[in-house]
Amino acid sequence: MRQSGRKSNQLRPISLELSPLINAEGSCLIKIGNTHVMCSASYDTTVPPFLRNQNRGWITAEYSMLPGSTSQRNKREAVQGKQSGRTQEIQRLIGRTMRSIIDLQKLGERQITIDCDVINADGGTRTAAITGSYVALHLAIRSLMKKRILKVNPLINQVAAVSCGIYKDQPILDLDYLEDSDAEVDSNFVFAGNGNLIEIQGTAEKKPFSEEQFLEMLKLAKAGVAELFKLQNQVLLNL
């Protein structure tokens, strides 16, 4: 039993609030336990220079943590004049994940920007951002099709992500901050809706982990994202 009372294979309580932002084409406030992330998807007709006149679209992402999202105030990176390596890593992860589930040719010469702003951080912010961003992107595509900006749906898959780790020698699902801070192994799994993997991030924080432990984490992650996919589908089908 974990400090939170959860079982090793148990996700934190999850909610997905659709369209909390009125100006973005699509938005979602995802809450996983005490980790809350506002995700939005905005449409633009300007694509990166390398894609001009190629009738091919692009999806990019930006990620940030609000100053009050952590126990000690987190300084705004804009004030410091540069993004941290962590921020750049996470927004690249979100961007390439979203591009992997879109037919960029069908998107046409358009760009969708995914914005992920962490309101409250208690572990798993990047995986929450990915899971919420899919919902925001889905809503944005639906809006663009309704406006007849898009004639064909470019979405080709679903995506969700979850963290796993080795904590006190036990593989566990969906680490909170206290677990993440003291874990022997920290990993993130990004899955497509068809069961294929999009990305795996895994680090031995204290000691190397075995293939058997990795496979146990993979099994936990597959079961966890199955629950996330089910929740995504429930909220989107009820529109």
Curated annotation (Swiss-Prot):
It catalyses: tRNA(n+1) + phosphate = tRNA(n) + a ribonucleoside 5'-diphosphate. This is Ribonuclease PH. InterPro entries: ExoRNase_PH_dom1, ExoRNase_PH_dom2, ExoRNase_PH_dom2_sf, PNPase/RNase_PH_dom_sf, Ribosomal_Su5_D2-typ_SF, RNase_PH, RNase_PH_bac-type, RNase_PH_CS. PANTHER family: EXOSOME COMPLEX COMPONENT (PTHR11953), EXOSOME COMPLEX COMPONENT RRP41 (PTHR11953:SF0). GO terms for molecular function: 3'-5'-RNA exonuclease activity; tRNA binding; tRNA nucleotidyltransferase activity. Keywords: Nucleotidyltransferase, RNA-binding, rRNA processing, Transferase, tRNA processing, tRNA-binding. HAMAP family: RNase_PH (MF_00564). The keyword tRNA processing applies. Phosphate binds at residues 86, 124-126. It comes from Rickettsia bellii (strain RML369-C). One of its GO terms (biological process) is rRNA processing. The keyword Translocase does not apply. Belongs to the RNase PH family. Phosphorolytic 3'-5' exoribonuclease that plays an important role in tRNA 3'-end maturation. Removes nucleotide residues following the 3'-CCA terminus of tRNAs; can also add nucleotides to the ends of RNA molecules by using nucleoside diphosphates as substrates, but this may not be physiologically important. Probably plays a role in initiation of 16S rRNA degradation (leading to ribosome degradation) during starvation. Homohexameric ring arranged as a trimer of dimers. Its EC number is 2.7.7.56.
